[in-house]
């Protein structure tokens, strides 16, 4: 395997937020930012591995503020660790008024990509060695975060969702269109995350009976590719409320429209807050009724505790040389 130069371990995408990027609320937020994150992460992973790559995990996405239409956007993806076939990539989205060029962060998260060959089988990637003490600290944090991620995945996988649950549930259903295709002929991981955000918003706004905005997305696990032309079902269920927050579990399933069989492709936990004049506002409190409700409410609280055990996203990050 040929060596990959250190400069290939990061990439910055730069563009203007266009009117077509607008989401609910009149700004660019949630699902569109997730699409940008996936594209930058893919570019970084493909550049490092020299292979086609697939998204397998996106975690701890913290939406700190929306991006305004017309702002200059920078999406920086940097490699922070490699496994045998996987690449852990830290992605930061920042934006600025073009007249000032003063960037502020809008969101940050960790993504995991796996390099695959022409038959879709995982292939080995070059080992990344931290070039600086700061990079070594990021790698150490990424390794600690990997265990937390495994705990989150295990907890999410153990939960049961049946008709016994009473939390508000909303489902979006549609066909995966040719315009959703990625470089490998499947549906973009970022597109799937946008669908997740949209379904969660419908659920949150319906429960709150008012405005809501995404503040967190986590545990986004991609189990299998989603094919163009498939029937897609995105089901969002309320599983916990805080004073201003709504925790929503989202499952994406897909299948051949000629059959009724649907397979799980993606699972995620989203957190929305209620809004009143663009400020966080109290939301109606959900009270678990069934045993399943109680278990899912406890699960959401457990995930809150797990998220406090990682420090990778709390570190100060220098902006890359532009």
Q: What residue spans do the PLM features occupy?
A:
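Short coil/loop residues immediately preceding or within conserved phosphate-binding loops
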Residues: 12, 58, 171, 212, ...
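Hydrophobic, helix-prone linear segments
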Residues: 1-76, 103, 286-288, 304-306
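Catalytic strand-loop segment that frames the active site of acyl-thioester-processing enzymes
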Residues: 1-29, 140-195, 203, 208, ...
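Active-site helix/loop of acyl-thioester processing domains in fatty-acid/polyketide metabolism
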Residues: 31-51, 190-212
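A cross-kingdom feature marking solvent-exposed beta-strand/loop segments within repeated
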Residues: 55-74, 94-99, 107, 213-224, ...
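HotDog/MaoC-like acyl-thioester-processing domains
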Residues: 2-13, 67-69, 80-150, 228, ...
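Catalytic cores of nucleotide-enabled group-transfer and carboxylate-activating enzymes in metabolic
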Residues: 39, 177, 188, 198, ...
């Amino acid at each position: 395997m040929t060596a990959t130069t250190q400069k290939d371990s990061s990439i910055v995408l730069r563009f203007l937020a266009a009117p077509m990027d607008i989401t609910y609320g009149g700004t660019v937020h949630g699902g569109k930012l997730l699409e940008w994150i996936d594209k930058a992460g893919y570019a970084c992973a493909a550049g490092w591995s020299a292979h086609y790559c697939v998204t397998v995990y996106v975690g701890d996405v913290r939406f700190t503020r929306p991006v305004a239409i017309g702002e200059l956007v920078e999406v920086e993806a940097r490699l922070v660790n490699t496994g045998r076939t996987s690449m852990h990539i830290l992605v930061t989205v920042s934006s600025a008024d073009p007249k000032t060029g003063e960037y502020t962060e809008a969101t940050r998260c960790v993504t995991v990509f796996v390099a695959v060959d022409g038959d879709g089988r995982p292939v080995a990637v070059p080992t990344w060695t931290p070039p600086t003490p700061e990079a070594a600290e990021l790698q150490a944090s990424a390794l600690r975060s990997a265990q937390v991620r495994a705990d989150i995945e295990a907890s999410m996988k153990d939960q049961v969702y049946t008709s016994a649950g009473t939390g508000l549930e909303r489902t979006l259903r549609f066909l995966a269109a040719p315009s959703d295709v990625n470089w490998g002929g499947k549906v973009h991981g970022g597109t799937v995350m946008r669908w997740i955000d949209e379904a969660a918003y419908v659920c949150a706004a319906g429960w709150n009976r008012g405005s809501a905005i995404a503040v967190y997305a986590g545990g986004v696990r991609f189990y299998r590719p989603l094919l163009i032309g498939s029937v897609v079902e995105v089901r969002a269920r309320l599983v916990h409320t805080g004073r201003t927050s709504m925790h929503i579990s989202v499952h994406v399933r897909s299948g051949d429209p000629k059959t009724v069989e649907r397979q799980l492709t993606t699972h995620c936990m989203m957190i929305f807050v209620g809004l009143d004049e663009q400020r966080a506002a109290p939301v109606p409190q959900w009270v678990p009724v069934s045993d399943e409700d109680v278990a899912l409410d406890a699960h959401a609280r457990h995930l809150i505790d797990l998220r406090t055990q990682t420090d990778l996203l709390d570190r100060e990050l220098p902006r890359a040389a532009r």
